[in-house]
Amino acid sequence: MPKVLHVADVHLGARPYGLEERRDDIFRSFEFVVETALKDRPDAVLIAGDLFDKPKLPLRDVKQAVELVRALTDAGIPVLAAHGEHDTPSVRDETLLSLMEASLDGFKAPLYRSGMRPGDFVVDLGSLKVAVVPFFKVPLEERRRLTLRFLREFDQISRTSSGTLVLLAHMSLDAEMQFDAVASPSDLPSGAKYAALGHLHAPRIRLDAPTPYAYPGVLDPLKVEEINTPGSPLYVDLSGDAPIIEKVKVPRRPQYRIEVDIGDGGSIYNAVNRGLRRVLANVRASREDWLKPLIHVIIKSDKPISKARVIAEARKAAGGADVLLKIHWKIVAGGEHAGTSPGLQGEGPLDLAKIAAEYYKIPLNAASTILHDLAEAAAEKDELRVREILETLATTVSQDTWKRILYMR
């Protein structure tokens, strides 16, 4: 009976913080997934969107990705991928996934083209059928309308289809994340045995839903906020009345987070050194692999600071420790220099995330994430990533909001 390996949000080609080591980490994690599948031989590997981090990548990244997927298809293991927002270009064009589909027997990644119907997105693997929801890079209301249309037709197909039907999609459900949600759990096909979903980087498993569904989470944490909730590929056994899920533990580079508050005017070196000593003691006690730990140092301050000085002293505090350091900056609200604007009135510091959330009518945590991503991309001089983030915002914010922004005086 069918057994599938469900993975999502792989982001091949990503280079978090501009580190080539992190690019290699992500490929190493996906290689582990491939090796696991080759050993256990599931009936299919399902990739629920964002196999790639960008629609266009260096040829080196594409070549390595193709070689890994080919190892599965050459072994007779079908691989099905849904498109996500990261591997779908803004303009209607061929994608890296569609090019892979054309060149690899056994790899399917249906790409929506004008005139296609939902039935064209059902991949028949014999006793297992997979209904793939295409990703529509259009404004949110239109994406929601198109997605619901596919889900309704997949529901009809699921009621009459023989064998086991699984839904594969890269989308948010409103029960998990209101921001950019396109459907509710009740909209999932009632006759589907399981919905293999992607998009949420924090894992979710909901086997008690009317149609059981899960988000494996991000394969390798891309942000410091994700290191405590890493994802896990999921083995899903569909042979019984209800899916049985087993998490696959992926060996990863250890990542640690320390926060250093230098707002009290004390020694930057001493503050960083104390935090690093605590983490390094834990690293030495628990280290089991050959990869250098990545230590995120969160510098908190309520006043202007010399970033060059902080970086120099943080590196000095790390001494000869065999680690990777990433410095993050966090302005603490309420300080004298936390933020002012001569044209705005009100009490307290300027909260850009709150302003963006209220202005664009999106949740506060979503606004914070967007601003964080923009800051990281700008710091790394990644113009393409900046453009992609802005395009995501443009397709997420409602048309009424954009009209209000464009026509306000």
From Swiss-Prot:
Name the Enzyme Commission number(s) assigned to this protein: 3.1.-.-
User: GO molecular-function annotation terms?
Assistant: 3'-5' exonuclease activity; DNA end binding; endonuclease activity; manganese ion binding; Y-form DNA binding
Superkingdom? Archaea
Q: Does the keyword Manganese apply?
A: yes
Q: What EC class is this? A: hydrolase
Q: How is its activity regulated?
A: Nuclease activity is regulated by Rad50.
Q: What are the recorded Gene Ontology BP terms? A: double-strand break repair
Manner of cofactor binding, per the entry note? Binds 2 manganese ions per subunit.
Q: Which cofactor does it need?
A: Mn(2+)
- Locate the active site: 86
Pfam families (UniProt xref): Metallophos (PF00149)
Binding of Mn(2+) 1 occurs at: 9, 11, 50, 201
Q: Residues that bind Mn(2+) 2, according to the entry?
A: 50, 85, 170, 199
> Keywords assigned by UniProt?
DNA damage, DNA repair, Endonuclease, Exonuclease, Hydrolase, Manganese, Metal-binding, Nuclease
- What is the similarity comment for this entry? Belongs to the MRE11/RAD32 family.
Summarizing the function annotation, the protein's role is: Part of the Rad50/Mre11 complex, which is involved in the early steps of DNA double-strand break (DSB) repair. The complex may facilitate opening of the processed DNA ends to aid in the recruitment of HerA and NurA. Mre11 binds to DSB ends and has both double-stranded 3'-5' exonuclease activity and single-stranded endonuclease activity.
State whether it acts alone or in a complex, and with which partners, per the record. Answer: Homodimer. Forms a heterotetramer composed of two Mre11 subunits and two Rad50 subunits.
Q: Which PANTHER family match?
A: COMPONENT OF ATP-DEPENDENT DSDNA EXONUCLEASE, NUCLEASE SBCCD SUBUNIT D
**Record HAMAP family:** Mre11
Query: Could you identify this protein by its name?
Result: DNA double-strand break repair protein Mre11
Q: Which organism is it from?
A: Aeropyrum pernix (strain ATCC 700893 / DSM 11879 / JCM 9820 / NBRC 100138 / K1)
